[in-house]
């Protein structure tokens, strides 16, 4: 029974991803990179502001790619689960 809980969480995650589609990415990217930008500006003594802008831009690109890759992987797994579990 120990495997039931993570599986249930994964199912919820997949459902959430599918319901938001790629629209979920901007929120994910914004949250992740806003935190990164805040962290950078807090360390203003070490890094000039234009570095923070570059860091933020890189973060947006990377996080968007990560999010889209995760979504396509989750959707792929979800489809596989349906095709394999519906056998008699």
Swiss-Prot record:
Cell compartments where the protein resides: Secreted
Top-rank taxon: Eukaryota
UniProt GO molecular function: pheromone activity
Signal sequence, renumbered to the chain: 1-19
Disulfide bond sites: 25-33, 40-52, 59-67
One Gene Ontology cellular component: extracellular region
Keyword list, A-Z: Disulfide bond, Pheromone, Secreted, Signal
Propeptide part(s) removed at maturation, as residue ranges: 69-88
Biological role stated in the UniProt entry: A component of the complex of water-borne protein pheromones that stimulates attraction and mating behavior.
Quaternary assembly: Binds to attractin and temptin.
Protein name: Enticin
Natural source organism: Aplysia californica (California sea hare)
Lineage: Eukaryota, Metazoa, Spiralia, Lophotrochozoa, Mollusca
């Amino acid at each position: 029974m120990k495997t039931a809980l993570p599986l249930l969480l994964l199912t919820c995650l997949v459902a959430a991803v599918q319901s938001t589609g790629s629209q979920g990415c901007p929120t994910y990217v914004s949250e992740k990179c806003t935190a990164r930008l805040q962290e950078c500006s807090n360390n203003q003594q070490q890094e000039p502001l234009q570095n923070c802008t570059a860091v933020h831009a890189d973060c947006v690109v990377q996080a968007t790619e990560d999010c889209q890759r995760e979504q396509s992987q989750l959707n792929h797994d979800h489809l596989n689960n349906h095709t394999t579990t519906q056998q008699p």
